[in-house]
Curated annotation (Swiss-Prot):
Species for this entry: Omphalotus olearius
Protein name: Methyltransferase/ribosomally synthesized cyclic peptide omphalotin A precursor ophMA
UniProt-annotated stretches for the region Clasp domain: 252-378
EC category: transferase
Protein's GO biological process: methylation
Length: 417
């Protein structure tokens, strides 16, 4: 049974709505909005605002605390205090912010820290950020070849380092050096300071992508490609606004460390990797990237094997009851049910009808692998082996670690076609 050391009435949950109107709000976020005693929100489009108001009638719009010439930091302090005050009254409060509620958001972090320090239950739920949208719309993978993310003014003030071998993402490029707020937009008159730094690091002809995520479902994102020098042109500079983000692709690819490749045994003895990583698809925004064919001999061989594919012996398809599927969905989307389960696993599991004995036992235990075994109808001996020998069980066939992605960098080292 899992119990909480925090017994104070009142809680704070911070959620995000994503960037694109309504559609990027998670089911988890929506469930907390619906269950809250009071909701405070700060969103950027009226459709999302209207949607929130249909899900909970006890809502407060935090956007009203901005004002022309008013310090944004003062506004953020006020926003956080408004939420914490209601938590202190014993209410279950939800704070809603656009995008990811913890990415380039000040009041969410402040309110959470204060609530936690005073002994209240407080947590943040993830959301879709502008950077997530950027990765999707520009079709880039932050893991290849790595990514640095900065706020533009901080990037300049603290002389943050740049790696010309990695992606660079700069937020708030439309309000460089501006600490206050204006309903009509920002006079970005220090923008040239940012351009100077980019030219210093990358040169005048290096590409920069001006990115704005789509905020409405009928819109397309802005993905305009310029050179650093073109950013100095007034007609282009004035397109950069408060919701603009810059993506700067790598200037060059870093050479592989041959000694490390040998130590990791990524290549057969005597085989030497390419000087430049060759990965398909290539980054369309990056200059001088080697072309790679989509159907190399190794790809064709892998595709040919599909004709003879059969699920391996260790693969376990889903084999769960409707009762178990329904209760796991309820735990994911019903905050009250989740609280009841966390308070007493056994009592909750006993109250659920139509579970199989293995499913009920797993739910009582609350162990994620026990639940996986029950829903996949896997032998309980696998779970027992894992408990007895820990990591050793994974070497004997227990799926202790699930790998759902392949790092392209390793693949590029191993391919010499």
């Amino acid at each position: 049974m899992e119990t909480s050391t925090q017994t104070k009435a009142g809680s704070l949950t911070i959620v995000g709505t994503g960037i694109e109107s309504i559609g990027q709000m998670t089911l988890q976020a929506l469930s907390y909005i619906e269950a809250a005693a009071k909701v405070f929100y700060c969103v950027i489009d009226p459709a999302t605002e209207a949607f929130i108001l249909t899900k909970n009638k006890n809502c407060v719009d935090l956007y009203q605390y901005y004002d022309n010439g008013k310090s944004r930091l003062n506004t953020y302090t006020q926003m956080s205090e408004l939420m914490v005050r209601e938590v202190r009254k014993g209410l279950d409060v939800v704070g809603v912010f656009y995008g990811h509620p913890g990415v380039f958001v000040n009041p969410s972090h402040r309110a959470l820290a204060i609530a936690k320090s005073e002994g209240y239950r407080a947590r943040m739920l993830p959301g879709v950020s502008a950077e997530d949208c950027l990765f999707a719309d520009l079709c880039i993978d932050p893991s290849n070849p790595g990514c640095l993310t900065y706020e533009a003014s901080d990037f300049l003030i603290r002389d943050r380092p740049v790696s010309i071998h990695s992606h660079l993402v700069l937020f708030q490029v439309g309000c460089v050096g501006i600490a206050d707020f204006n309903f009509t937009g920002f006079d970005n008159n220090k923008f040239g300071v940012l351009v100077d730094r980019l030219e210093q690091e990358y040169g005048a002809e290096h590409p920069v992508v001006h990115y704005i995520a789509a905020m409405m479902p009928h819109q397309d994102p802005v993905t305009d490609k310029y050179t650093v020098a073109q950013l100095r042109e007034p007609e282009i500079a004035k397109r950069v606004g408060g919701v603009s983000t810059f993506y700067i692709p790598p200037k060059a690819r870093k050479a592989s460390n041959l000694d490390i490749i040998r130590r990791l045994e990524l290549l057969p003895a005597g085989q030497v990797p390419d000087k430049k990583a060759r990965i398909y698809p290539a980054n369309q925004w990056e200059p001088d990237v080697p072309e790679v064919e989509p159907y190399r001999p190794s790809d064709q061989a892998a595709i040919a094997q599909l004709a003879d594919h059969a699920p391996p012996e260790q693969y376990q398809p889903l084999a769960t009851s409707k009762a178990m599927s329904d209760v796991m969905t309820k735990l994911a989307l019903d905050p009250k049910a989740l609280a009841d389960y966390k308070a007493d696993h056994r009592a909750f599991a006993q109250s659920v009808p139509d579970l199989t004995p293995q499913e009920r036992a797993a739910l009582e235990l609350g162990d994620s692998w026990a639940i996986r075994c029950a829903m996949k109808n896997m032998p309980s001996s696998l779970l027992d082996a894992a408990r007895e020998s820990g990591e050793e069980a994974s070497q004997n066939g227990f799926p202790w670690v699930i790998v759902v992605g392949v790092i392209g960098v390793i693949g590029s080292v191993m391919s010499t076609e």
